[in-house]
Amino acid sequence: MDIEMNRLIIRKHGVIGMALRKARASDLTRVMEIKESVVPLMIESGNTQWSEDYPDLERFKEDLRMETLYVFEEEGCIKGFAVVDDDHPYPYDDIPWELTRADSRALHRMAVDPAYQGNGISTGMMEEIEDMLIEKGIKGIHTDTSLENEKMQYQFEKNEFEFKGKLNLDDNLDDWYVTYEKVFEDDGID
């Protein structure tokens, strides 16, 4: 197993035991448990971005195969997950991003187990993702979420992502998404 896959990135807040790492095949059951626990809450709040059928196990297996699925773990318990890749959907071309595709990565399919929501896990995950990307020379993140997904929009805004516009991903004019970008601060170190 390669070192990168097992590398743990300890939170800059100094909270020991919390880390973002690349997912392993053995994590897929827990990823699906989290997904299945958030879907009813999403639907209850009027957000139909995810469903029983999406994202499915095959989607996460593909993310795993592409080495883009990450889990956020604390004391051996996976509390959340996210996909970080360079898959910028074609409609992203219509958004006035500050950064190019080459200079950024896309954040997709992020969730936190409802049992741990409200404890800073989303913020911790986003900070760890940012640290990981900065370390790799990436300058920022592009992302989107359903117009209905107010909780995720709140998380993006709380974590200093800038609203960039609306887009339609599915050619369904009733299904709009909002886009966000975070450009990482340049610390002046080269």
Language-model features: where?
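Conserved acyl-donor/pantetheine-binding loop and adjacent beta-alpha core of acyl/acetyltransferases
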Residues: 83-109, 117
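Conserved GNAT-fold acetyl-CoA-binding loop/helix
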Residues: 39-59
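Conserved beta-hairpin
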Residues: 67-85
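A short beta-loop-alpha structural element at the N-terminal edge
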Residues: 19-33
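C-terminal "cap" of GNAT-fold acetyltransferases
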Residues: 99-103, 158-159, 169-190
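Conserved active-site alpha-helix within GNAT-family acetyltransferase domains
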Residues: 123, 135, 148-165, 173
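Conserved acetyl-CoA-binding loop-helix of GNAT-fold acetyltransferases
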Residues: 112, 118-131, 154-158
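Conserved GNAT acetyl-CoA-binding A-motif
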Residues: 126, 133-145
